[in-house]
Swiss-Prot record:
Protein family per UniProt: Belongs to the PP2C family.
Catalytic activity: O-phospho-L-seryl-[protein] + H2O = L-seryl-[protein] + phosphate; O-phospho-L-threonyl-[protein] + H2O = L-threonyl-[protein] + phosphate
Enzyme Commission number: 3.1.3.16
Natural source organism: Oryza sativa subsp. indica
Keywords: Hydrolase, Magnesium, Manganese, Metal-binding, Protein phosphatase
Protein name in UniProt: Probable protein phosphatase 2C 34
Lineage: Eukaryota, Viridiplantae, Streptophyta, Embryophyta, Tracheophyta
Amino acid sequence: MLRAVARCCGHWPPGAAAADGMLWQTELRPHAAGEFSMAAAQANLAMEDQAQVLASPAATLVGVYDGHGGADASRFLRSRLFPHVQRFEKEQGGMSTEVIRRAFGAAEEEFLQQVRQAWRQRPKMAAVGSCCLLGAISGDTLYVANLGDSRAVLGRRVVGGGVAVAERLTDEHNAASEEVRRELTALNPDDAQIVVHARGAWRVKGIIQVSRTIGDVYLKKQEYSMDPVFRNVGPPIPLKRPALSAEPSIQVRKLKPNDLFLIFASDGLWEHLSDDAAVQIVFKNPRTGIANRLVKAALKEATRKREVSFRDLKTIEKGVRRHFHDDISVIVVYLDRHRGRRHTRVVDSSSNCTNAPVDIYSSNSGQSVETLQAHRGSGW
């Protein structure tokens, strides 16, 4: 059991590198209820997205972690979230919303400890965070938990027809939403700056668009943002209470025969494709390479908006690419079999884990991740 979790939190399997060295995909792989497909595209100098699937005969875990301010928090989640889920699931004897809530809380607390330990040497760690999207399929029950603006969408067949419709399964915690702005204002009635329109978007404290994350300690604990050490990172930020939350939104539903597939993806995909467009692509095309097809559809839309060709995009280096699109991570999970068994365990001795590369460019170019991390001075 522990070896399976260790494999999941370690190296990625060999994937199919596209001609574009910033793309990655892997072949179709089995999970408890069918098959899944994964793909990713790098835009940032350091890949800030991370994605993984842990599959056993009993159940499936899916994780998409969209980092910001650096890759530390998303890489941390890649290595630590699933073990926390596994630990609490074992303690409680099955999957539940409480297991997921405790796993998110434990991950947040553990990352805070990492920030404390690195504070004097790397104060920038306090300004690093990540969105966190978790899916768990246990028997015929689906759990989806979310912090931030990554998204899970269900493709569902219309009863009596050959048409698929999209159903969004996540609440997005982004200040672009009027509901989120109202929530922030209600929680902070004495803070006129809790949500500000700055640099073309609504932002919490005029800084960050997402309102719930793992990390971003400087917007949760004033002792970090007001410490003189933090002045090397940014201006002091007075806080009467945490501006951001790590409390996930959790949805639970019973899977039905008309539920065809799930799409889990970072907002790098959704800023270019609608829920319905993504569902139609998956519904109308072969399974092989389907996640990569979604990534390429988003990239083509991004290039159309920027009035450059997709061929030209392939020549643009990492870092510069961020002006055209964000990092993109996509996992498509097909729902072929709905087992009615209850209290199934998430991890067992025959579990298999698939991770997207920590950094696509270094993976495709042959540069070791260890070398890349040493060059950046990363702690992960």
